[in-house]
UniProtKB/Swiss-Prot annotation:
Keywords assigned: 4Fe-4S, Amino-acid biosynthesis, Branched-chain amino acid biosynthesis, Iron, Iron-sulfur, Leucine biosynthesis, Lyase, Metal-binding
NCBIfam families listed in its UniProt record: leuC (TIGR00170), PRK05478.1 (NF004016), PRK12466.1 (NF009116)
Taxonomic lineage: Bacteria, Pseudomonadati, Pseudomonadota, Gammaproteobacteria, Methylococcales
Protein name (record): 3-isopropylmalate dehydratase large subunit
Function (record text): Catalyzes the isomerization between 2-isopropylmalate and 3-isopropylmalate, via the formation of 2-isopropylmaleate.
EC number: 4.2.1.33
Length: 470
């Protein structure tokens, strides 16, 4: 019998019951909650006369609707304000720990979970949010769920799920200087497509993955969902353990030692068999820029906008044509010739301290281009913001004409005051470039923090590996 994959191990450890049709009841170790997908779930509990099964397994934070500027004035939009106030009330009523808007620990849910050590190896972790896959960077099985499932987890601490297939994405070799985890995962999505991981859980492995920091691994797993995968995983190693030790929710003392011993087995066995294997040479990856309205519509920064006429598949060709029309781009346009109106550095993909340091390194000593209307820097949490300010990064950005904001989801999605106007083009470190994602009629190009920072300085995309560091 062949060995087990990391996904097999995590799944098997959490199966409570198997039905005749193969569906499984699995136990959930950690439930992360935010203000958008939880109100109906809590109301369902009240109507049924239920209470959360394990209060301590839940951690809540408001992030999607919170303002990132003038926070002391409160939330102007009444719908956004109601969602945040409802979360506050629900957490108070049911005794759930919440990092409120005025708490320094508040931030984007997929930033604060790992930051607090609430995300731990071997766990099953769910949240009513697509990018819950982020937490798989810690050797945890993490995936997004719907509102009805949020209620189910609150009430029972279990979920009915079907096991996905196993995919291995092995990235061998080392990334070139200036090429980041964001470029790596965009290149993967460009290779396999947004449906390439459908029905699979993807384990990311290889020298390039092992060489990433935890911040980088979180970026990769964050965007596994954009490849269609149910979840993304990275095996536990010393990098994982070094990141987690001493964090508030992590075990300590003898419990830490016991946990580390258990976590050391959280890797795929050498003889494990995967249903699908994708091999990528890290040296072939260059800084990436999306040109269309799907993360798979991506090319290296030194390339040109592709021509739909060269695409044999009629469905893909039509998709490309529609994307070019929406993005107002012509085939053959050099990526470096695309000018941007706004720049957004933030989101659960790229708003951690390492991301801000990378952007600040590019910005230092330069000014935002006059043609760029706005360059937003939004830390992923209050603690990230505080650390960045202790390092003087806020001054670097402010002196360059960037805006330094409070933590939140911000311009990743048009659900708060930070959004694009119709026709505006944005270099964004977020994870989705769908039509209208950052605002009605807004045009999004996904890039790394360093690439976004360089675009803000130059007013257009530049290759930061070819002397384009402003």
């Amino acid at each position: 019998m062949s060995g087990k994959t990391l996904y097999d191990k995590l799944w098997d450890d959490h199966v409570v019951h198997v039905d005749a049709d193969g569906s499984c009841l699995i136990y959930i170790d950690r439930h992360l909650i935010h203000e958008v997908t939880s109100p109906q779930a809590f109301e369902g509990l009240r109507m049924a006369g239920r209470v959360p099964w394990r209060v301590d397994a839940n951690l809540a934070v408001a992030d999607h609707n919170v303002p990132t500027a003038d926070r002391d004035r409160g939330i102007a939009d009444p719908v956004s304000r109601l969602q945040v106030e409802t979360l506050d009330k629900n957490c108070a009523d049911f005794g759930i720990t919440e990092f409120a808007m005025d708490d320094v620990r508040q931030g984007i849910v997929h930033v604060i979970g790992p930051e607090q050590g609430a995300t731990l190896p071997g766990m099953t972790i769910v949240c009513g949010d697509s990018h819950t896959s982020t937490h798989g960077a810690f050797g945890a099985l993490a995936f997004g769920i719907g509102t009805s499932e949020v209620e189910h987890v609150l009430a029972t601490q279990c979920l009915v799920q079907r096991k996905a297939k196993n995919m291995l994405v092995r990235v061998q070799g080392k990334l070139a200087p200036g090429v980041t985890a964001k470029d790596l995962v965009l290149a993967v999505i460009g290779r396999i497509g947004t449906a390439g991981g459908t029905g699979y859980t993807i384990e990311f492995a290889g020298e390039a993955i092992r060489g990433l920091s935890m911040e980088g691994r979180m970026t990769v797993c964050n965007m596994a969902i954009e490849a269609g995968a149910r979840a993304g995983l990275v095996a536990v190693d010393e990098v994982t353990l070094d990141y987690l030790e001493g964090r508030p929710f992590a075990p300590a003392g003898a419990l830490w030692e016991r946990a580390v011993e258990a976590w050391k087995d959280l890797h795929s066995d050498p003889d494990a068999v995967f249903d699908k294997v994708v091999e990528i040479d890290a040296a072939s990856i260059k800084p990436q820029v999306t040109w269309g309205t799907s993360p798979e519509q991506v090319v290296p920064v030194d390339a040109e906008v592709p021509d739909p006429a060269t695409e044999a598949d009629p469905v893909r060709r039509e998709s490309m044509e529609r994307a070019l029309q929406y993005m107002d781009l012509l085939p053959g346009t050099p990526i470096g010739a695309i000018r941007v109106d706004r720049v957004f550095i933030g989101s659960c993909t790229n708003a951690r301290i390492e991301d801000l340091r990378a952007a600040a390194e590019v910005v230092r000593g330069h000014k935002r281009a006059a043609s760029v209307k706005q360059a937003l820097v939004v830390p992923g949490s209050g603690l990230v913001k505080r650390q960045a300010e202790q390092e003087g990064l806020d001054k670097v950005f402010l002196e360059a004409g960037f805006e330094w904001r409070d933590p939140g989801c911000s311009m990743c999605l048009a659900m708060n005051a930070d959004r694009l106007e119709p026709g505006e083009r944005c270099a964004s470190t977020s994870n989705r470039n769908f039509e209208g994602r950052q605002g009605y009629g807004g045009r999004t190009h996904l890039v790394s923090p360093a690439m976004a920072a360089a675009a803000a300085i130059h007013g257009h995309f530049v290759d930061i590996t070819e002397g384009g560091r402003a």
